[in-house]
């Protein structure tokens, strides 16, 4: 997750001051992102820094992507230090982000132009890693970047306007995802979570959040079902899938490993209330260490 945001920000370079407005929270900013069928991700980097978590899960500079290191050197922008929040919508049409932090717009503009991009007024455009990855961005505020990676080389401009449609529920957590039912039905999730994803295919909404809890991180799931009966059945299915996973681990004569996904999933607990299903998992530091180790290979 951290690597994903870093990669997107490393691909992004910004413009100049456009207009100034009061700081907005995730609910207000979310109105500007496409939400229909979108995977929504929110990360409060400032909160993670204050909690001492970001440094623990951030890759050392020596292991970061060389292109990202070059971007940091030439723009003096480092997400671990300068990015406060990131709100992103991942859709079939592209990736759309609102990034709040401290930006040296002059350096970002120069970087874009040096990479064969162009900047007109406050909007900058540049080619991404492939022909269909056109990057566009501009400052909605001095500390708020609108960024799009899409086939449309001006897609970031759309983020000025509000988008009609339903809003996901926003949990009180520094990291959260709103997962569209379309993604759950697509089979595009990691193999280890497929049994759980299949159980969630008929849910009306699924929100996952991550927040510090002592020396661990708590992952919580909030699912809205169509009926109370659906919620009770989903709770039963998820509990059975978790019990089956624990049985398989035991049959292999091993204990759940907190450093891998199966160990995290095996810690799951579920309950329902009316048409809601709540899930809970414990995530230890070893899991994040393992993720970083895999990312460095």
Which sequence ranges carry the predicted segments?
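Short hydrophobic-aromatic micro-motifs
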Residues: 39-43, 97-98, 136-139, 143-149, ...
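A cross-kingdom marker for long, charged
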Residues: 252-297
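Short amphipathic alpha-helices in soluble, non-transmembrane regions
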Residues: 109-117, 234-239, 294-295
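Envelope-exposed proteins and targeting segments
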Residues: 35-39, 93-95, 141-143, 217-219, ...
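Hydrophobic membrane-insertion alpha-helices, especially the h-region
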Residues: 1-15
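An internal, short helix-loop-strand segment that often contains or flanks glycine-aspartate motifs
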Residues: 51-53, 59-80, 118-220, 224, ...
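One face of beta-strands
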Residues: 39-41, 97-101, 204-208, 215-223, ...
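Long, low-complexity, Ser/Thr/Gly/Pro-rich intrinsically disordered segments that act as flexible linkers
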Residues: 17-118, 212-214
């Amino acid at each position: 997750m951290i690597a994903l945001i870093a990669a997107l920000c490393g691909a992004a370079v910004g413009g100049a001051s456009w207009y100034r407005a009061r700081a907005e929270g995730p609910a207000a900013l979310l109105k500007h992102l496409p939400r229909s069928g979108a995977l929504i991700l929110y990360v409060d980097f400032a909160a993670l820094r204050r909690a001492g978590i970001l440094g623990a899960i951030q890759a050392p500079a020596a292991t970061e992507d060389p292109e990202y290191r070059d971007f940091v050197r030439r723009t003096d922008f480092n997400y671990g230090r300068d990015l406060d929040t990131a709100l992103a919508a991942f859709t079939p049409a592209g990736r759309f982000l609102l990034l709040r932090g401290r930006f040296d717009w002059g350096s970002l503009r120069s970087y874009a132009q040096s990479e064969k991009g162009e900047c007109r007024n406050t909007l900058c455009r540049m080619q991404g890693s492939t022909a269909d990855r056109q990057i566009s961005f501009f400052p909605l505020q001095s500390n708020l970047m609108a960024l799009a990676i899409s086939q449309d080389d001006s897609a970031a401009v759309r983020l000025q306007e509000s988008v009609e449609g339903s809003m996901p529920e926003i949990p009180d957590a520094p990291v959260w995802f709103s997962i569209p039912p379309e993604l759950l039905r697509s089979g595009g999730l990691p193999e280890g979570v497929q049994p759980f994803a299949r159980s969630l295919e008929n849910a009306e909404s699924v929100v996952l959040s991550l927040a510090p809890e002592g020396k661990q991180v708590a992952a919580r799931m909030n699912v809205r079902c169509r009926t109370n009966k659906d919620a009770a059945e989903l709770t039963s299915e998820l509990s059975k899938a978790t019990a089956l996973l624990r049985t398989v681990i035991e049959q292999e004569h091993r204990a759940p490993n907190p450093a891998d996904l199966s160990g995290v999933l095996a810690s799951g607990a579920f309950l329902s209330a009316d048409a809601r299903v709540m899930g809970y998992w414990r995530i230890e530091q070893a899991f994040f260490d393992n993720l970083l180790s895999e990312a460095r290979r």
